[in-house]
Design a protein with these regions (language model features):
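Beta-rich catalytic cores
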Residues: 17, 43, 87
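A short beta-strand motif characteristic of beta-propeller blades
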Residues: 34-40, 76-82, 125
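Residue-level detector of Asp-centered blade-edge/turn motifs that repeat once per structural unit
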Residues: 2-4, 49-53, 95-97
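Short glycine/acidic-enriched loop and turn motifs that connect beta-strands
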Residues: 13-17, 63-64, 106-109
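Short loop/turn segments immediately following beta-strands, especially the blade-tip
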Residues: 24-31, 67-74, 112-124
Length: 125
């Protein structure tokens, strides 16, 4: 993304529409959002961006999906990782982007997954 340009990522539940992430160009001068793309994902209940700004991670009904953030702000799917049936409600990376933390909504548990340098999610640690 070029300096001075902003992109917003909005996650949502999907009922009748399979696009759970919407990507918006942000016009800071006029305070407007313009939808530029949408991503097919089921019930993207929460998302986070890695500390290095290169990757986006989203919780789904079935686990966590990893995306590369392209120079124009679009997203490219890297991979998916299951979280053993846990229904995640929060996702975050550590400061070095080596681990992904997923907090459980119903059970209050925390699942930790290892991350590779390319942003892909490995198995639960």
């Amino acid at each position: 993304m070029s300096k001075g340009k902003y992109v917003a990522y909005v996650s949502s539940y999907t009922q009748g529409d399979s696009h759970g992430i919407r990507i918006y160009d942000v016009d800071m001068k006029n305070g407007r959002f313009k939808e530029k793309d949408k991503v097919e994902i089921t019930n993207s209940s929460y998302l986070t961006i890695s500390h290095n700004g290169k990757f986006l991670y989203s919780i789904t009904d079935f686990g966590v999906e990893a995306y590369t953030i392209m120079p124009d702000g679009d997203l490219e799917l890297i991979n998916f990782a299951p979280i053993n049936g846990m229904r995640g409600c929060y996702v975050s990376t550590d400061y070095t982007d080596q681990y992904l933390f997923v907090a459980g909504y119903h059970d209050g548990k925390l699942t930790v997954l290892r991350l590779k340098e390319d942003g892909s999610i490995e198995e639960i640690t």
